[in-house]
Amino acid sequence: SAALLDLETGEVHQEKQLLPVKAGEAGLRQSDAVFHHTRQLPELLERLRPFLAENPVCGVSVSTRPRNVDGSYMPCFLTGVGTARAVAAVTGVPLYETSHQVGHVLAALYSAGKLGACEKPFLAFHVSGGTTDSLYCEPDEQAALKITPCGTSLDLKAGQAIDRVGLMLGLQFPCGKALEQLAMQSRKPFRIKPVIRGVDCCLSGLENQCRKKLEQGEPPADIARFCLMTVAETVIAMTKAAQERHGKLPVLYAGGVMSN
């Protein structure tokens, strides 16, 4: 994805495109992700060019890694970093580096009209295919937002669980939207018992539970509902645990899974 922000009007122009994933597969190998990023990013930037006609570039920002923690690395980020460095060098403007996770949190605040929340500490959740994290967030003059990890999934991530269950039910990756639509066809009540370890959670059992339900002949809609309810109850339990540790701070939920 790529976007332009007009600092005078606050207007945002964005372009985004999902990376292609073959039917039946749960994601991409890193080498394939790098290839598709390299091929698609120039196309997105070209679509934004008309909005630059009367507005010079004054800065470039890029996500350089998944999270602001030591050892956080994925090769596909190099494509964006290389492109951003080239644009900044050619235009002679500053380059601002951030992380994918900080971007998710700030984007959620922006879309909710709550950017002012960055002025005080708050809790955030980043729930996606690669993370199920509770985060302690506080103001930072250099990085706009300082994020300290609080809790996480000790095994399977929420988005991984949703996609694996979705593929199990014959849905196309990424499965979140279709799984939600399927779950809405069910009204079956479930007693969910999330697995919590302090401020952390465990989700690997969810996949096994859903597979067992499928083998026992339970309707796909009921399985989809059970899957999403389990993820929701897990996040609720993690929220309570995070607030017990850090106090009753405001809570923000971000990431692809939170749209389901």
Q: What is the predicted function of each stretch?
A:
Residues K177, Q181-V251, V257-N260:
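A contiguous, well-structured pocket-lining segment that forms one wall/lid of small-molecule binding clefts
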Residues E46, P50-R85, A89:
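Short beta-strand-loop/turn "lid" adjacent to the catalytic site in phosphate-handling enzymes
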Residues S99-V102, C137-Q185, N208, K212-G217:
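Glycine-rich phosphate-binding loop plus the immediately following alpha-helix
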Residues K16-L18, H36-F51, T234-T239:
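Short, well-ordered amphipathic alpha-helical segments that serve as non-catalytic structural scaffolds
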